[in-house]
Amino acid sequence: MLKKYLFLTKPGILFGNFITTLGGFFLAAQGSIDILLLLLTLIGTTLVVASGCVVNNVIDQDIDTKMQRTQNRALVKKTISPTVALVYAFVLGVMGFSILWFGVNGYAFLFAMIGFIVYVGFYSLWTKRTSIHQTVIGSISGASPPVIGYTAVTHQFDVAALLLFLAYALWQMPHSWAIAIYRFDDYKNAGIPILPVARSIYRTKIECVIYILLFAAVLNGLYCFGYTNVFFLITFNALTAYWFYLSIIGFKAENDQLWAKRFFLYSVILITLLSLSFSFTYQSPAPNLPLF
């Protein structure tokens, strides 16, 4: 019984957002970790993300029946009712937002709210079914957790927070498209107008190259503005260079699905290593460049 409710929250997404929240927190903390604040930030963010994922499951019931990857979800199999799922999402959301508001700060609460509203409203209810730009919209919600982690410590939105937001949003474009290429038939059967389906796999590969270059350019800004050290500069660019290499060899791939799987898995490794590296690649003291 409990397993059904756990999988309703999409544990893979929870883990990914847990890591990126941790990364933002590490960068801001500069080695001085407030354990209680860290725990409250991680728990609050995870609960909010879990709430959004449960609501997404409710919204996507009709789509999930058409996709092999999602045909066994609890709402599709009707082992959990939509009403129970929404109550579950409400409880998770109330707990998560309360922790961020009362235990962290208004900035963390604000960016959690932005991420939730974009994911549930603008992505799940609207653009996922209607627009080729759905991934751009969805990337806003995916880029919120590192900013939540960062502002939990700094109590302000500064240049580093902006760079984190932009970089993590840019990373999500090729990451998400790789899933769509790997599961191309699923997305096509469900009628989801994501780029590989709505345009072509070749066009998607071109845009993956562009977004990887933009991702690298933006995140190098952390070093240029003095937020990270030279070790970050070297290791980040080495890791990203290999991702870029994978994007280039994709044009000669004999099997697009196998290439996309490899490309996707490396994107996960990259963002995980990047986020964890902020625990020791920060530059202290960091510049004070607040935006609001």
UniProtKB/Swiss-Prot annotation:
Coiled coil: none annotated. One of its GO terms (cellular component) is plasma membrane. Keywords: Cell inner membrane, Cell membrane, Heme biosynthesis, Membrane, Transferase, Transmembrane, Transmembrane helix. One of its GO terms (biological process) is heme O biosynthetic process. The chain crosses the membrane at residues 13-33, 35-55, 84-104, 106-126, 135-155, 161-181, 206-226, 231-251, 263-283. Its EC number is 2.5.1.141. It catalyses: heme b + (2E,6E)-farnesyl diphosphate + H2O = Fe(II)-heme o + diphosphate. It comes from the Bacteria. InterPro entries: Protohaem_IX_farnesylTrfase (IPR006369), UbiA_prenyltransferase (IPR000537), UbiA_prenylTrfase_CS (IPR030470), UbiA_sf (IPR044878). Carbon 2 of the heme B porphyrin ring is defined according to the Fischer nomenclature. Belongs to the UbiA prenyltransferase family. Protoheme IX farnesyltransferase subfamily. This is Protoheme IX farnesyltransferase. It comes from Acinetobacter baumannii (strain ATCC 17978 / DSM 105126 / CIP 53.77 / LMG 1025 / NCDC KC755 / 5377). The gene is cyoE.
